[in-house]
A protein has these predicted regions:
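Loop/turn elements at helix/coil->beta-strand transitions in domains of secreted/extracellular proteins
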Residues: 3-4, 63
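A conserved catalytic-loop motif detector
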Residues: 6-9
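Beta-propeller domain segments
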Residues: 11-19, 26-44, 51-52, 57-176
């Protein structure tokens, strides 16, 4: 609708080294960038503090951008939780590498730092290490009405849990 192309740029590390924070934030690695969809001009970092978003979609109800975020590995079977996050305005920060969801990140000592005060929390928590990839808001007419406006997400499944989970299609209702 806005003529912009939104691209997620995942972290190239399980947890980024401290000396990469400024560079990655400046160019949008571990974030979401946007640019003119027709000629690539007006590129800007739209959001930061994201580990590895793969799927994203615009909510047709309010136009906000929602996305999945894959978790840090090696912290345990059930932490950190997977996330579905909503961007409501440009410049939002989602906490990574200091926190992911409700879990402080221990690698490189990020858990010893004060938690940044400007963290926007996820809208939905998913199973840890299920690897939520694609997602889409459902607006079709083939499924019952309870699915309208909700999110279908695809999980490719875990590789690093004691008891693997996935691959599966999940549904998240956004109705209160």
């Amino acid at each position: 609708k806005d003529g912009m192309l939104y691209v997620s740029l995942g972290q190239p590390h399980n947890v980024q080294p401290r000396d990469k924070i400024k560079l990655y934030n400046d160019v949008g690695i571990g974030g979401m960038v946007r640019m003119n969809a027709f000629d690539g001009s007006k590129r800007e970092v739209y959001a930061t503090g994201i580990r590895n978003s793969v799927g994203h979609d615009f909510n047709p109800k309010d136009g906000t951008l929602w996305f999945t975020d894959n978790q840090t590995d090696g912290m345990g079977d059930d932490i950190p939780a997977g996330e579905i996050i909503r961007i409501t305005k440009a410049g939002q920060f989602f906490g990574y590498p200091w926190i992911q969801g409700k879990t402080r990140i221990t690698e490189h000592g990020y858990d010893k730092d004060p938690l940044p005060t400007n963290v926007t929390n996820p809208e939905v928590y998913m199973d840890a290490h299920a690897a939520d990839l694609g997602m889409a808001f459902y607006t079709g007419k083939k499924f019952p009405a309870k699915y309208q406006g909700g999110i279908f997400s695809a999980q490719h499944g875990s590789w690093n849990r004691t008891n693997p989970i996935g691959a599966r299609i999940m549904f998240t209702s956004l109705k209160a």
